[in-house]
Amino acid sequence: MEIAKTVRLYDQDAYATKFEAEVLACEEVEKKEGKVYQVWLDQTLFFPEEGGQSPDMGTIDGIKVLDVQIKDEVITHTLAAPLAVGTMVKGVVDWKHRFYNMQQHSGEHIFSGIVHNRFGYDNVGFHLSDSIVTMDFNGVITAEDIEKIETEVNQAIIENIPVEVSYPTKEEIKVLEYRSKIEIEGQVRIVTIPGYDVCACCAPHVRRTGEIGMLKVMNVQSYKGGVRISILCGFRALEAFRQKADIITKLMAQFSTNQEALVENVTKLKNTNQTMKNQLASAKQELMEYKVAAIPEDSENAILFESDLDTPVVRNVVNGLVEQFTGICAVFVGNDESGYQFIIGSKNKDCRQIAAALREKLSARGGGSDKMIQGSVAASQLQIEELLATL
């Protein structure tokens, strides 16, 4: 099936939300979630998933648009219900989602432009989702420099600079210095933010930088010899700040402190908690030593069942049992209802054979070496004891 290239109305007006189009084709497609319908129109306002950005959302003739993709300049709309071929339909773009994406993308351009101009680094990986924007730069940027760039981006936003879109000729593009994430064939669309960035881009952008509202760096991490920087702009940045402010307010109430002392209070709590964990582990270790001492010295096997015990303590106990007893040495942690985690060791028996028996008779999981195995089993204490007694 050959479909004509889709007229991209969003290139003409990024702020338009309603349009009419003719249905050129409609196909039923089976997906994991059920049947969906791929629809092709002669023209559309729906921006597809392209250039690292999530697609537009909305409806066509009241039917929810589930996805929008582009290939060879043909845009495919995936809908929850079919549309009749040859009919005229009305599309409505979710403006809130579109504008939020525009804020993110325009903010990213300013940030990436500043990085490129100052350090010569390229944005080699870009992803704009509904929750975060990530940029991968092929060079290291210090925390101090990132903070300066963030401030400069917000200064550019305050300046309310016009965002310009142009379509240079082949001759003009040859001498134009611009950023580009990929090799582009055919007509190149250039988005310019004077003084900050010139970049090839297919996505809708705000008219002026002031509409971005603000930009906030949310996270920074080393990535493939460079740096991955996560940002949010505009209303999404505001929503994230509200969430963080709400968390801080609740924590201040819990600790009966102010914001300045909050980190210190949390650190103290963390240290106290770790101290108590260490003390509890020591107490459990000491208790287990008493239980081990209570096992008759002439026993061949030494098997203990505990309701709650940390893995390091279990391993220490099993290692100690192996030194004292010649048979199966094991600690099972849990209960008959939810099952048991176990570590089994022996210096005279092949633990792999014990694991095989547990798998065969009790459907246990796990494995290890001939000296020690580790795993889990959904069986009762009585069933486990009866099986181990036969080995």
Segments the model singles out, each with a brief description of its role:
Residues 1-391:
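A glycine- and charged-residue-rich anion-binding loop/surface
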